[in-house]
Design a protein with these regions (language model features):
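Amidase signature
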Residues: 29-106, 271-472, 479, 494-499, ...
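Short, hinge-like loop/turn segments at secondary-structure boundaries
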Residues: 131, 175-178, 226-229, 462-464
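Gly/Ser-rich catalytic/binding loops embedded in alpha/beta enzyme cores
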Residues: 32-206, 435-436, 500-502
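N-terminal chloroplast transit peptides
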Residues: 1-23
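Structural helix-boundary/capping segments
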Residues: 25-27, 34-41, 45-70, 152, ...
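A short helix-loop-beta submotif of the ANL/AMP-binding
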Residues: 154-155, 475-483
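Short glycine-enriched, charge-decorated loop/helix-capping segments at active-site entrances
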Residues: 127-136, 459-464, 511
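Short glycine-enriched loops at secondary-structure junctions
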Residues: 116-118, 162-164, 233, 450, ...
Length: 538
């Protein structure tokens, strides 16, 4: 798709009212050195043309390719295919997937893209894998429920996006298709596995983009690309029509450049909150050990964000209602613990259930996820790539580990039961801890990622180490099945904070709440970032 045709499509989809000459700003990026923010240049859209949005430095986003190396859209769903699919979706999409909360036209005039592990009727689903694409040569006969919901709500489909191979990575790098260019800082990774969706939104190619999140695949790229991202309550949004990874952790998610658009996406996808429409958050728990897991500069930037949260909503985040907590216990890594904790050690100083340290959360998550992945995909892999020769580095290692774990389980069932039981106990303790921390209207504040994105040229060992540090933070909502919203740190900045230059890399802060409070959490994100959104609109 050419830049001209894509811009024309976006302009037609938005309608004449949205194609005004009013400037639109895509956001601001916080400096990881704690020196304020770098504000994006305003971009004007008019009836004749729709300029690509420019992010961290002039000309960066306009240079982001849509297809090919560095592009965020897949080649097997090209411009002609998109045009044909779009017309078919607009005329014949079933209304069966419309949620009770989705009013007709709640996404009218908005455009959206779809991660390539989600089915779109008339398009092939590649899941970031040439082997998967070759094994599934026929276009999907039906769309994923979430795609139908967006179309029924009035959104216009503009393409399918690149992703990490079979969604089992977090860096956004695909050995077969390349790495989508991060519009914020092109030399850094965009994050994954929903890399193309985050980039498409950040670059202004669409208003919303669907992704999936098993262990951070929406929250991490949202943080790295400087956009908003949402992982809903597990099971709140149907996963029908999605290539699975680890079903007990898999969720659908979505991206937007501002919280109001993110909320509108939730209106199309989410059922009503179980807590009712009058629910309000009343206090905050700041996860101190999660902040300690960040690099020093990121922790400093995000702690200033916590202060800004208090300035914007004292009812929830003010000193009287805010407290520091630890998600996990204070013990060392598993190898350093010589005994199981005594009953007295299972409660923290406030009498709340204690949980193992965050490092143990990640170990447990990895053990459970690895086994689920092989149950979900092992049969297909054995049939199509038994020697795992068609996978890229990192991803291949993880599938090898999953296969070996399955073989070991058959060879020694008792040992397997012990491994799974220990991991499940950690999961249950972590989930209980988060239930206590989010009860009665509390929201947990934690980093979306431990630092800014690393360079695209990083060595494999550095990539894997950074992935592990990310997962220590992101597995929390997976264990709890809880909703989590990623907010760009810069969206909380004050207008007078000024600019730090074009080299500033985005970082994100997250709010996590109890399962079933999704819409309330999205509304809180809108409230907290309303000032920044108004500046961008103005």
């Amino acid at each position: 798709m050419s830049s001209t045709s894509a811009r024309a499509l976006a302009a037609r989809a938005r309608g004449p009212r949205a194609r005004s000459t009013r400037a639109r700003r895509l956001g601001v990026f916080a400096s990881t050195a704690g020196r304020g923010v770098s504000r994006a240049r305003a971009v004007t859209r008019d009836d004749d043309a729709s300029a690509d949005s420019t992010l961290a430095s002039p000309g960066v986003a306009s240079a982001i390719p849509r297809y090919g190396e560095g592009g965020c859209f897949v080649d097997h769903c090209d411009a002609a295919t998109v045009s044909r699919i779009r017309e078919a979706l607009l005329t014949s999409t079933s209304t069966a997937s419309r949620t009770p909360a989705a009013g007709p036209g709640c996404l009218s005039s908005l455009t959206f893209a779809v991660k390539d592990n989600l089915d779109v009727r008339g398009a092939r689903t590649g899941a970031g894998s040439p082997r998967w694409l070759a094994a599934h040569p026929s276009p999907a006969e039906t769309s994923a429920r979430a795609v139908d919901a967006f179309v029924n709500a009035g959104a216009v489909f503009v393409g399918k996006t690149q992703m990490d191979e079979l969604a089992w990575a977090l860096q956004g790098q695909n050995a077969h298709y390349g790495t989508p260019t991060n519009p914020a800082v092109p030399s850094l990774i965009p994050g994954g596995s929903s890399s193309g969706s985050a980039v498409a939104v950040a670059a202004g190619f669409c208003d919303l983009a669907l992704g999936t999140d098993t262990a951070g695949s929406v929250r991490v790229p949202a943080s790295y690309c400087g956009v908003f991202g949402f992982r809903p309550t597990h099971g709140a949004v149907s996963m029908l029509g999605c290539v699975p990874l680890a079903p007990s952790f898999d969720t659908l998610g979505w991206f937007a450049r501002d919280a109001e658009t993110l909320r509108r996406g939730g209106d199309a996808l989410l059922p009503d909150d179980v807590v009712g429409v009058d629910f309000a958050f009343v206090r905050a728990a700041v996860a101190e050990d999660a902040f300690e897991a960040c690099d020093g500069a990121t922790a400093e930037t995000l702690r200033r964000c916590v202060d800004r949260l208090a300035a914007k909503n004292a009812r929830v985040f003010g000193a009287a209602n805010r407290r520091g907590v630890r998600l996990g216990g204070g013990g060392g890594a598993p190898a350093e613990r010589e005994r199981d904790p005594s009953p007295d050690e299972t409660r923290d100083a406030r009498g709340l259930p204690a949980a193992p340290p965050l490092a143990e959360w990640w170990d447990a998550f990895r053990a459970l996820q690895t086994r689920e992945v092989w149950r979900a995909l092992g049969g297909w892999i054995e049939a199509h790539d038994a020697r795992l020769e068609g996978f890229g580095p990192g991803v291949r290692d993880r599938f090898c580990a999953a296969r070996d774990a399955a073989r070991d389980a058959k060879a020694d069932p008792e040992a397997e039961l012990r491994i799974v039981a220990r991991a499940a106990a950690t999961r249950d303790a972590a989930a209980a801890r988060l239930r206590e921390l989010t009860r009665d209207g509390a929201v947990v504040v934690l980093p979306s990622a431990p630092g800014p994105p690393i360079p695209r040229t990083s060595a494999a060992r550095e990539v894997e180490a950074f992935r592990a540090s990310q997962l220590r933070l992101t597995c929390a909502s997976g264990f709890a099945g809880a909703p989590q919203v990623t907010i760009p740190a810069a969206a909380l900045a004050e207008a007078e904070d000024g600019e730090t230059g074009s080299g500033s890399a985005p970082v994100g802060i997250s709010l996590l709440s109890a399962p079933g409070t999704d819409k309330a959490l999205l509304a809180l994100a809108v409230e907290l970032t309303e000032e920044a959104s108004s500046r961008r609109r103005g």
